[in-house]
A protein has these predicted regions:
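Surface-exposed coil loops of outer-membrane beta-barrel proteins
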Residues: 1-66, 75-82, 174-186, 238
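Outer-membrane beta-barrel pore domains
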Residues: 74-241
Length: 241
């Protein structure tokens, strides 16, 4: 997310790569020529300290990356969560697989991502049947530098869907709070189909370490009680060191 093109991560990325969690665990990574590998084993306990118990549940991660050439990389990422009924669980799904393509040229680039997974059931802490079932999603994010290393134009389209009425969810900002038809209950941003379009400009003050981001986003969610649409205008300052 350090070189993110949009003001906020996509809803499906927030779901699969749960924001804010720092699980206790172990990682083993290796690089051989154009290939890189990662294996991870984590406790699902919510305690972020190293002395977290290992009697709650386990999450298993596997990542495989291939650098096709200087501009193009492919990445596959898989996570399986075996937490059971009554056990702590930091991931809100049973398993998820993502496939990602990253292409970076001189002044432009594009990232394409595909996701598929299972929301889980009572064993994973998902007690409501309408929030269980399978989900799938696609996100495409092209960008172009109008001024090299200074002014960036970005676009993102994301689509997600589920077999259940509330199997996918939008980001927390801002459709859940304000949408076109206030008589329709947005259901916490949950539904069975979601489209989102984003267009923005980023002004890089110090590469991606400090940048000003502006954008407009349109969301279309098929919630349990009806269709919900909304437009969000973004102005953000993002920094990392």
């Amino acid at each position: 997310s350090k070189k993110i093109v949009t003001a906020e991560r996509s809803g499906v990325s927030n779901k699969v790569y749960v924001d804010g969690i720092r699980p206790t665990g172990f990682k083993l990574s290796a690089i051989k020529q154009d290939w890189d590998f990662l294996l991870g084993l984590y406790s699902t306990e919510e305690n972020p300290e190293f002395d977290a118990k290992w009697d709650q549940g386990l999450a298993y991660q596997g990542t495989l990356g291939y650098q096709m050439n200087d501009e193009h990389k492919l990445v596959a990422d898989f996570l399986y969560n075996d937490s059971g009924v009554g056990q702590e669980n930091q991931w809100t799904y049973e398993w998820a697989l993502s496939l990602r393509s990253e292409y970076v040229a001189d002044r432009w680039g594009v990232m394409t991502e595909g996701f598929v997974g299972d929301n889980g059931d009572e064993a994973n802490g998902v007690t409501k049947a309408e929030r269980q079932g399978h989900f799938w999603a696609a996100v495409i994010t092209p960008y172009y530098y109008i001024i090299p290393d200074r002014l960036q134009l970005g676009f993102q389209y994301q689509y997600s869907a589920s077999t259940r009425d509330e199997g996918v969810r939008t980001s927390s900002r801002y459709l859940r709070r304000n949408h076109a038809d206030p008589t329709v209950d947005v259901g916490g941003g949950r539904g069975n189909e979601h489209h989102s379009y984003y267009l923005g400009l980023n002004y890089l003050l110090c590469d991606h370490n400090a940048k000003i981001m502006t954008g407009i986003q349109y969301d279309d969610l098929n919630a349990e009680e009806g269709k919900v649409t909304g437009t969000t205008y973004w102005f953000a300052y993002r920094t990392f060191f």
